[in-house]
Amino acid sequence: MQFSIVVMAALASLASAQSMDGIPTCALQCLAQAVVTGGCEASDQACQCGPAREAITAAATPCLLSACTDAADLATAASVGNGMCDKYKMGGDDAAPSPSVNTPAAAAPYPTAPAPNGTVPIGTAAAPSPTANTNETTTVATGSAPQNVAGGLAGIFGLVVAAAFAL
């Protein structure tokens, strides 16, 4: 069970790295092969972060554990791949944007009253508070954009490394 949770959390990190910087050479072939086994193109993060996530992780994990015997290599790769699918799903770095969201406004934590002589009473802020407005809606177009091969592979490696540490 713990392995599955870590694998899913790691899989959620598939889409932000845009280069192979920091990915150990021992991992490259395993990752490339796992992406193909999962049925995705190396540059297709929509596939890697979606329907093929479990298949890619299942294919890459035993290979990486065998090929990368240095724990430091696994840890380094995990830090590089961290956050990739989350970033992809949030629309970061050439990723497909997420659909629009309408969030209700948060209530003020306490009422405020004007202060005499332009001072700010304790417990209030001079700058506007970061609360949402119920009348505001953020709309973002949906779609996908090609990603470079390194970004997809780095994210998958981060997933597999996290899974390995959970064992």
From Swiss-Prot:
InterPro entries: Extracellular_membr_CFEM_dom. One of its GO terms (cellular component) is plasma membrane. A lipid is attached at residue 143 (GPI-anchor amidated glycine). GO terms for molecular function: metal ion binding. Residues 1-17 form the signal peptide. GO terms for biological process: biological process involved in interaction with host. Glycans are attached at residues 117, 135. Residues 18-112 form the CFEM domain. Disulfide bonds join 26-68, 30-63, 40-47, 49-85. Induction: Induced during infection of poplar leaves, with highest expression observed four days post inoculation. Heme binds at residue 44. Pfam families: CFEM. Belongs to the RBT5 family. The CFEM domain is involved in heme-binding and contains 8 cysteines and is found in proteins from several pathogenic fungi, including both human and plant pathogens. The CFEM domain adopts a novel helical-basket fold that consists of six alpha-helices, and is uniquely stabilized by four disulfide bonds formed by its 8 signature cysteines. This is Effector CFEM8. It comes from Marssonina brunnea f. sp. multigermtubi (strain MB_m1) (Marssonina leaf spot fungus). The gene is CFEM8.
